[in-house]
């Protein structure tokens, strides 16, 4: 019964060590899990193309990129807390034949503002209609709740093509 004793000893102490206020360092696997869950992507559906330890503003982060459903995701997760420092998303591009602006500016603004709970028109800081490879798109920026959201919305389909989130210091 010598094998049973070490297993018993481990059940009491480590459980409390890990639950101190729920904040602590995260490893690479935990950082990937945090990013995937935030994006609503199952690990089985993601093809991780980059996962490495990096530094952002002097802070250790895991830089994690993956593709899922034709879209690209890019996350930075703080090593010391597991906090999402930044997250980005680039959707599939529509065909170049969709060069008519069929989505109104008001509808596109509503799409963007609906993604940021509590934000209103006064939180929109940049807004313009631009063309990317002949495709019309709205580009904008929302600053709300200490966070900056930069986005691109396809002006022909209304689809969110890019969505980048960064906490402001």
Language model feature labels by segment:
Residues 1-169:
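Long, terminal "pre-/pro-" and other extracytoplasmic accessory regions
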């Amino acid at each position: 019964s010598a094998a049973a004793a070490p297993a018993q000893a481990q059940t009491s102490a480590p459980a409390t060590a890990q639950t101190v206020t729920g904040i602590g360092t995260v490893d690479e696997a935990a950082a990937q899990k945090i990013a995937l869950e935030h994006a609503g992507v199952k690990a089985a559906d993601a093809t991780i193309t980059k996962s490495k330890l990096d530094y952002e503003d002097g802070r250790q982060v895991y830089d994690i990129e993956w593709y899922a459903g034709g879209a690209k995701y890019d996350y930075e997760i703080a090593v010391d807390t597991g906090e999402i420092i930044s997250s980005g998303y680039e959707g599939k591009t529509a065909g170049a034949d969709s060069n008519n602006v069929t989505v109104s500016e008001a509808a596109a603004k509503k799409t963007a503002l609906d993604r940021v709970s509590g934000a209103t028109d006064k939180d929109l800081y940049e807004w313009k209609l631009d063309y990317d490879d002949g495709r019309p798109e709205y580009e904008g920026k929302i600053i709300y709740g200490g966070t900056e959201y930069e986005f691109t919305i396809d002006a022909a389909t209304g689809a969110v093509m890019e969505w980048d989130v960064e906490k402001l210091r």
